[in-house]
């Protein structure tokens, strides 16, 4: 089943719904990123104000809720979603999201979607869309969940995953990471559906957080001394960001970079290394803080595009950039402080990437865990005795966090430091340690993990 070829199109979707639909198609057909495609479409077409806000809600909400929407669509259509034409399926997702999770009038949600189906296809396909959406509109989300979700008593994790539109394996990974606090699972999953504030980082020695907050009409952050919150807006248009006085960076990432500089190291000679530097936000913070103690940062990044971003974000700072694989750098060992912000599944930042929860697969974990262990081993080899490695990920998956650290402790002459004091007293109540796991529902940050290791010999 493919879209038909026809004459001039009539009665297209309104601009907001059209932008949302085209973004959904880009995500489905080209593996594009909604948070990159949609803003460009809105700017190109001059869509602003309420229309832009509506398009954003439809796009990001539909991307996040895809699994739940597909289950409802499949039940209403009495066929597998995979058997439905991909273009029709995206239209159905857009319509179903409006019916179940917005206050849009049901008639408007159905009629606009059916009209677009008639433009994209023919009357028969439009009739199919009409029938499915009218069936869905006959019940609210709670009713559909009650019918389709796993039983909450027999499968609480599966039930929570369905209700909050996450793949079950991700909900299980969060539950495993929470451990004794598994009762917070629903709060973790719900936080992924909340639109996060934009976090900025004031460049140390250039601008204070207070000065930045006044310049951009934001709010000084709760934890990082560099953080400023913006409720919404395009940070790339802000003068301090354009001029290099501030960076767009989650507050948790700021705390990770700061933690490395606070780790106790006797006889610090100022040789610092960022082994996984792209896109350069943490490198810039390290270099800015390093200026206060005459430290120099070596940044390693193999990706050409990400290396270019490192160069852009660290211009004017004492940073040496090497465009090589962090596992094979040919660098002379002896670094005092090494940051390994390892490539990961990004499960801790799903709230910032609407489609990511459905794009990631369980098989990704094993490949990334292998890479993470290799990078951590390389970092330890480059660290001098008495020096510190800070290992971090923006994923709470145990294979990517405590699993990687446990592997390093078994195979290398390192000792795990209590990482909590490097975050306290800024953040209290970090648990039993020795490592730190931040959570969006507790701290308002991405779910960053951090572990500090001291090399012994």
From Swiss-Prot:
Name used for this protein in its record: Putative methyltransferase Rv1407
Residue numbers binding S-adenosyl-L-methionine: 276-282, 301, 325, 341
InterPro entries: MeTrfase_RsmB-F_NOP2_cat, MeTrfase_RsmB-F_NOP2_dom, NusB-like_sf, NusB_RsmB_TIM44, RCMT, RsmB-like_N, RsmB/NOL1/NOP2-like_CS, SAM-dependent_MTases_sf
Principal EC category: transferase
Described function: May act as RNA methyltransferase.
SUPFAM superfamilies from the UniProt entry: NusB-like (SSF48013), S-adenosyl-L-methionine-dependent methyltransferases (SSF53335)
A GO molecular-function descriptor: RNA methyltransferase activity
Active site as annotated: 394
